[in-house]
């Protein structure tokens, strides 16, 4: 199956994301209409095998009902060429660090800004060491808006110390998160991966670019990892 057409499917916390060649799509699995659109998309797509990864087990059965008529493979930790020394690690975290480690050929630290943010480490011996998980940017903004609806939405300011509510909310969310992940990166580099290349990915990564300009932004790390795993195991 060296020339097989592979449809990659990421079952995430908020969306189903697909990649077929250069074509990418997203569907909300919480929405019956969107799921119907996903099913219609599969019917008209030309692929030989569907390879999927699931980081939202609460959605998997629902999605399997849609894809079970197609030849498919589920990516598990055992399919990924990493020595995993952590426990109960989400497949999305493993896939992004695997892709980054292949790109950089050095120890890597990967920051993923999604529903949750993660900061994960692969050392020079190809060991996935683990990392951090926290509340993602979008989730923070939603929680703050719900808890304090009178606050204005965030807006970046050139002032070092914010003088407006909008700038204060920006610093308390965007900038605070940037400082948090930088602190974690520095902490993990001291712990034995001092020369690690730092990658950034995830749905909210573009919103953090100006605050982390010295890191390498790669918005397709997850799909890159999935493609590499598919090639290693089934193609």
How would you describe each model-predicted region?
Residues 2-67:
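Conserved phosphate-binding loops in N-terminal lobes of ATP-dependent enzymes
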Residues 2, 81-108, 223-235:
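Conserved phosphate-binding catalytic cores of ATP/NTP-utilizing and phosphoryl-transfer enzymes
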Residues 194-235:
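Long hydrophobic alpha-helical segments typical of transmembrane helices together
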Residues 134-191:
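Active-site rim beta-loop-alpha module in soluble metabolic enzymes
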Residues 107-111, 128-129, 150-159:
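Short, structured loop/turn "capping" segments at alpha-beta junctions
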Residues 1-26, 100, 106-128, 144, ...:
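Gly/Thr-rich phosphate-binding beta-strand-loop-beta motif of the actin/hexokinase/Hsp70
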Residues 47-56, 73-75, 193-203:
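Short glycine-rich phosphate-binding loop at a beta-alpha junction
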Residues 24-27, 66-76, 86, 212-220:
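Active-site regions of enzymes building and remodeling cell-envelope glycoconjugates
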């Amino acid at each position: 199956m060296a020339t097989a057409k592979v449809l990659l499917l990421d079952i995430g916390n908020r969306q189903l994301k697909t990649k077929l060649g250069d074509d990418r799509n997203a569907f909300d699995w919480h929405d019956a209409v969107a799921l119907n659109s996903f099913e219609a998309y599969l019917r008209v797509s030309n692929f030989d095998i569907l390879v999927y990864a699931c980081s939202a087990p609460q959605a998997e059965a629902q999605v399997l009902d849609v894809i079970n008529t197609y030849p498919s493979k589920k990516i598990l930790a055992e399919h990924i060429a990493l020595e995993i020394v952590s426990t109960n690690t989400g497949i999305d975290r493993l896939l992004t660090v695997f892709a980054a480690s292949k790109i950089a050929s050095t120890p890597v630290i990967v920051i993923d800004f999604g529903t949750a943010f993660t900061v994960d480490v692969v050392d020079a011996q190809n060991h996935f060491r683990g990392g951090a998980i926290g509340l993602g940017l979008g989730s923070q903004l939603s929680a703050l808006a719900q808890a304090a609806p009178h606050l204005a939405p965030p807006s970046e300011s050139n002032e070092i110390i914010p003088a407006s509510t909008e700038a204060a909310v920006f610093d308390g969310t965007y900038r605070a998160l940037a400082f948090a992940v930088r602190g974690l990166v520095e902490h993990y580099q001291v712990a034995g991966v001092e020369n690690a290349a730092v990658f950034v990915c995830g749905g909210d990564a573009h919103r953090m670019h100006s605050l982390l300009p010295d890191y390498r932004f790669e918005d397709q790390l997850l799909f890159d990892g999935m493609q590499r795993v598919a090639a290693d195991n089934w193609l």
